[in-house]
Amino acid sequence: MKMIGFEKPFKLEEGNLFKVYEQRKPTPENDDILVKVNSISVNPVDTKQRQMEVTQAPRVLGFDAIGTVEAIGPDVTLFSPGDVVFYAGSPNRQGSNATYQLVSEAIVAKAPHNISANEAVSLPLTGITAYETFFDTFKISTNPAENEGKSVLIINGAGGVGSIATQIAKRYGLTVITTASRQETTEWCEKMGADIVLNHKEDLVRQFKEIPLVDYIFCTYNTDLYYNTMIELIKPLGHITTIVAFNEDQDLNALKLKSITFTHEFMFARPIHRTPDMIKQHEYLEDITKNIESGHYQPTTTQVFEGLSPENLYQAHQLLEKQSMIGKLVINI
């Protein structure tokens, strides 16, 4: 099997250190399935992981994947060879930048049948992230009627996570306010279903003068930059969740006056620690498939590269590090 990996952490300005590696195709054990990978999607987390310590070389990144089940472990009950599946994987295992991959069935689901592989692969990592935010941290109802009258502010609505988060929030009855700054990103947010799109290059507090404070805020970009703004825009007893780690010290006491709940969302926590409820990721992906097939969600792929190669992977990382992507970037293997 072919893999694209690297021997040591590197920054892009050091040049392209991705290389092709070959190894024997693995055999699935326990609850693992062996997937022949058809397409992958590259995420910002790939660019961050590329710069982290390599404990076992070569490091093979890649999280989003779609492919065909080729073999199953003895404990597998959810899938059979021939099933077309999608998933987001885990950073503590070999990634999807390869022609074959082992993955636990608990974080996998059958892919939607009414869209292409290149479209479907845009959804697992960002979709699970958004589902965990809305249902595990915000604890919104699965009944849309019970969420009516509640609102969420999604910072950076045109990114990969923001794009699917907007659709999920609308599907389950929330009023959605997102942020963007360019005409094309504003139009994309509206296409995803946002009720209001604000300009995050301008003062958000001032733009909220005619908008009620929100119940929830989902920060998908630069938590440090928006920390104090989010505290101003959230309702008392509201809930803020971020997927972006702090790079500066922040005053947690600032949350006290409104009794704000603040949560970090990390969708890899379940597979890394093999939590007892890891199966939730399978269930969330199943719901994504159901909503794609029923027409409630749309895929978020905006760019496709042909062929898994060091050159394509390096170019994908370059595009993501510019932080101007709309939707998701996919590599068709």
From Swiss-Prot:
PROSITE patterns: QOR_ZETA_CRYSTAL. It comes from Staphylococcus aureus (strain COL). Pfam families: ADH_N (PF08240), ADH_zinc_N (PF00107). It comes from the Bacteria. Disulfide bonds: none annotated. Gene3D superfamilies: Medium-chain alcohol dehydrogenases, catalytic domain, NAD(P)-binding Rossmann-like Domain. Belongs to the zinc-containing alcohol dehydrogenase family. Quinone oxidoreductase subfamily. Keywords: Metal-binding, Oxidoreductase, Zinc. NCBIfam families: adh_fam_1. SMART domains: PKS_ER. This is Zinc-type alcohol dehydrogenase-like protein SACOL2177. GO terms for molecular function: oxidoreductase activity; zinc ion binding.
